[in-house]
């Protein structure tokens, strides 16, 4: 069974394969002219050998994860590669080797290891081990330090920056064309589906603001690296996320720096993988020695380290952007209430700003592939313009119910588990992205707000993938 979101499991024909079985990616072959025929035989050790006038071992065909992401065929075929490149086994191997390097004298090969932990995994693990979310963060920090982490961070600052960038991007697009529907961009399952299925039709509607994971990558590799006087290649950055799709996002070529020869995020592990790591050594999270999370961003350390954002469970994009736009565009700072348009569909919420019977702003939150598909089809039929902004997440109930959150216990329904996690989320203090710290970060590192540097580092681009259906994809 695939671990990725529903949006990543849909393709034209029979997509659930792995590269080792039948990859449909067309690979160019450099042909050499031959005066005589040749035979290709398979040797005992599995390699192919061409024999004509002589014998020659043929080059092994390799298909990378980047090939999979750039291919219009199967998406889940990348899963086999991710298992080895983005797994807890690979993480533990890297940490073990790094510990040995640090023990050597005059060593310049070891790396500084940084973990960045999102809020949703903390909630999932807190519920599993029946401890508070703050306690979970401290025990997790202690556990990661025991494995070899040098820094353990929350993603709060990246969450804040993502909201600030997204709201200003919406304002710019609205002023250019107030009929344009803008979609959020933090869900990699949704972005990958849009690139591969709808291409250039839908991509101009997607916000270019990077997800918090990738903003965190910039902050760790460049800002923190500068403070530590370390090149990006000497930092190993691990994120803890609620869904497997984040592994795909971290592997995008857009988030690899040729200058620094480094990815913004080197490895992604998930809530359920953390649980598995503990189970494999017969341990529990509360048994780990607690430690404080690190705060390297500015001098004023927050009293608490784990925060929620607005009233939704996936970053709060729709509500935050709505409040900001209502105030900036229409001088309206009234509190809003989420109006559920379809009571039986809790994954589709709509809310609006109305004045004198005229709807000035209409926003929506759409979770789950069914709602995504319906919205895209409405947009194609010219009916999607009634929404100015849509917060989209591929998983039903959003990131709190990510595909890699800790599984329900025996006999527990997924819906019940999700409700418990939502209750924990709503009890968290709410972050205020407009604060002295984020302003200082913009001034010190991004050369100010709205600068070329901030745009280059906090925004990304998307790529339409042309559909190629070669003969190898046909099942007879």
From Swiss-Prot:
Q: What is this protein called?
A: Probable cytosolic Fe-S cluster assembly factor GF22738
Binding of [4Fe-4S] cluster 2: at which residues?
A: 187, 243, 395, 399
Q: What the protein does? A: Component of the cytosolic iron-sulfur (Fe/S) protein assembly machinery. Required for maturation of extramitochondrial Fe/S proteins.
Q: Which family does it belong to?
A: Belongs to the NARF family.
* GO BP: iron-sulfur cluster assembly
Q: Which residues cross the membrane?
A: none
Record keywords, A-Z: 4Fe-4S, Iron, Iron-sulfur, Metal-binding
> Which organism is this protein's natural source?
Drosophila ananassae
Name any one GO molecular function.
metal ion binding
- UniProt binding sites for [4Fe-4S] cluster 1: 23, 68, 71, 74
Q: Which domain of life is it from?
A: Eukaryota
A Pfam family assignment: Fe_hyd_SSU
Cross-referenced InterPro entries, in alphabetical order?
Answer: Cytosolic_Fe-S_CAF, Fe_hydrogenase, Fe_hydrogenase_lsu_C, Fe_hydrogenase_ssu
Keyword Iron applies: yes
